[in-house]
């Protein structure tokens, strides 16, 4: 356990009194670690920091598990004094200010997209236990549900579900169906746009006779808004009044932003968190139930994934439909290998794979990342770290791709700034 945490965090952390904290000694007693991503200049972070301090203080005083949990602050501060001042308000240690490389690795590894964020992980393996610790602090202020591990979807969603004619059905009606858990709200323009597309996709899948259902989990700000929005939807919803169940579903899937569409198989296991991208990329619904594909063709609808972690992008000279197929076939084996390896470990893949042809999206990405115009061009782009890795060779072979990917995952490649 200690060795894993040393690899993850380094040998030393620091606390608000500028004292060092030995990670190996810390790891010898822990079972759960909370990674708290934040910034002193962020208003919501300051508010959450106060709540977390109260939660942490109560837990350490009264919980029978008080020695099994620790929090580590991962800062996005750019000014060391501001970071130090903020750290003095905390009762837990932090990653050293200078250790920016480890900070970015943690952001990428745990798919953090916003702050404040609190991710609880198994201290022995690093596996995510709970992605949305903010809701743990809000909903379980005494820490009675420690260690906040995931529960089966059927258990969390259990209870009556609404139809937009105000009739209800029990959640057991979902048994044996593929399910989309749709986190959305009327006040959010991207949500409303996705809902229009999703209504058509839902209709098309149902017409094929497939057992498919969607459950709307509202983030609306009033029941009136919920009712208005839900009237556009032909599927089911968690009642707006059942705030506790809505919150538990948000916690279960670590929702950090909307719209989010989680797709589940008939056993309630997750197929993908990227239901939004899958739906937009497959208007004919021919790929239902939308299992993740090892290699994607870069498009406007899936470009959002470039900001969710490191991505390998192979740029090629292709303009017509079908011309990208040889490029996809080139990187498919290594993409499948990486996907299978991390699926077996029940971890998210550390690298997504794209091919990009000659179009406006590709041109925009090249311009933004200041890439050469060469084609083919093999790259790994890490937007959150503002770093790129470029393999500019005359011939790109499977061996070249595998060596490039292996070097990146082993941290042997030297990044260039974006």
UniProtKB/Swiss-Prot annotation:
Where the record annotates domain Thioredoxin, the positions are: 109-309
Primary location: cytoplasm
Ordered alphabetically, the record's keywords are: Cytoplasm, Developmental protein, Differentiation, NAD, Nucleus, Oxidoreductase, Wnt signaling pathway
**A matching Pfam family:** Thioredoxin_8
* Matching InterPro entries: Thioredoxin-like_fold (IPR012336), Thioredoxin-like_sf (IPR036249), Thioredoxin_domain (IPR013766), TryX_NRX_thioredoxin_dom (IPR045870)
Q: What is its EC number?
A: 1.8.1.8
Show the GO MF annotations: thioredoxin-disulfide reductase (NADPH) activity
Query: Could you state one GO biological process linked to this protein?
Result: circulatory system development
For this protein, what reaction is catalysed?
Answer: [protein]-dithiol + NAD(+) = [protein]-disulfide + NADH + H(+); [protein]-dithiol + NADP(+) = [protein]-disulfide + NADPH + H(+)
Location comes to:
Cytoplasm, Cytosol; Nucleus
Q: Which GO terms describe its cellular component?
A: cytosol; nucleus
Q: Which PROSITE patterns match?
A: THIOREDOXIN_2
* Gene3D superfamilies, alphabetized: Glutaredoxin
- The enzyme's first-digit EC class, named in words, is oxidoreductase
Q: Write down the PANTHER family for this protein, in alphabetical order.
A: NUCLEOREDOXIN
Family affiliation: Belongs to the nucleoredoxin family.
Q: What does this protein do?
A: Functions as a redox-dependent negative regulator of the Wnt signaling pathway.
**What is the official name of this protein in its record?**
Nucleoredoxin
Name the lineage. Eukaryota, Metazoa, Chordata, Craniata, Vertebrata
């Amino acid at each position: 356990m200690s060795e894993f945490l040393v690899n993850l965090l380094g040998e030393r952390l620091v606390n608000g009194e500028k004292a060092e904290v030995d990670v190996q000694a810390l790891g010898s007693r822990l079972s759960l670690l909370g990674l708290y991503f934040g910034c002193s200049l962020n208003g919501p972070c300051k508010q959450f920091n106060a709540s977390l301090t109260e939660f942490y203080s109560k837990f350490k005083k009264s919980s029978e598990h008080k020695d099994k949990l620790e929090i580590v602050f991962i800062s996005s501060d750019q000014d060391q004094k501001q970071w130090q001042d903020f750290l003095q308000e905390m009762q837990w240690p932090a990653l050293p200010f200078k250790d920016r490389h480890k900070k970015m690795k943690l952001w990428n590894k745990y798919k953090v997209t916003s702050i404040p964020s609190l991710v609880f992980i198994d201290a022995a393996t690093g596996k995510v236990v709970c992605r949305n610790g903010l809701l743990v602090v809000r909903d379980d202020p005494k820490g009675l549900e420690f260690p906040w591990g995931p529960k089966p979807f059927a258990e969390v969603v259990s209870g009556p579900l609404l139809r937009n004619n105000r009739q209800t059905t029990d959640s057991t009606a979902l048994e044996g169906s593929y399910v989309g858990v749709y986190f959305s709200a009327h006040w959010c323009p991207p949500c409303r746009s996705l809902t229009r597309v999703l209504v058509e996709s839902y209709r098309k899948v149902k017409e094929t006779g497939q057992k498919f259902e969607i459950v709307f989990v509202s983030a609306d700000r009033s029941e009136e808004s919920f009712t208005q929005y839900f009237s556009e939807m032909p599927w089911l919803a968690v009642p707006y009044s059942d705030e506790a169940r809505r919150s538990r579903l948000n916690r279960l899937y670590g929702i950090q932003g909307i719209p989010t569409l989680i797709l589940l198989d008939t056993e309630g296991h997750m197929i993908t968190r990227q239901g939004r991208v899958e739906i937009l990329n497959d208007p004919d619904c021919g790929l239902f139930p939308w299992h993740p594909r090892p290699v994607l063709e870069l498009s406007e609808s899936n470009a959002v994934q470039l900001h969710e972690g490191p991505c390998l992008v192979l740029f090629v000279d292709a303009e017509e439909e079908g011309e990208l197929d040889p490029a996809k076939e080139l990187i498919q084996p290594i993409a499948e290998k990486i996907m299978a390896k991390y699926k077996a470990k029940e971890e998210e893949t550390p690298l997504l794979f794209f091919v990009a042809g000659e179009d406006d999206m590709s041109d925009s990405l090249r311009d933004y990342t200041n890439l050469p115009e060469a084609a083919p061009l093999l790259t790994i782009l890490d937007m959150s770290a503002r770093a790129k890795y470029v393999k500019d060779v005359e011939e790109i072979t499977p061996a070249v791709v595998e060596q490039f990917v292996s070097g990146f995952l082993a941290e042997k490649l030297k990044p260039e700034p974006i």
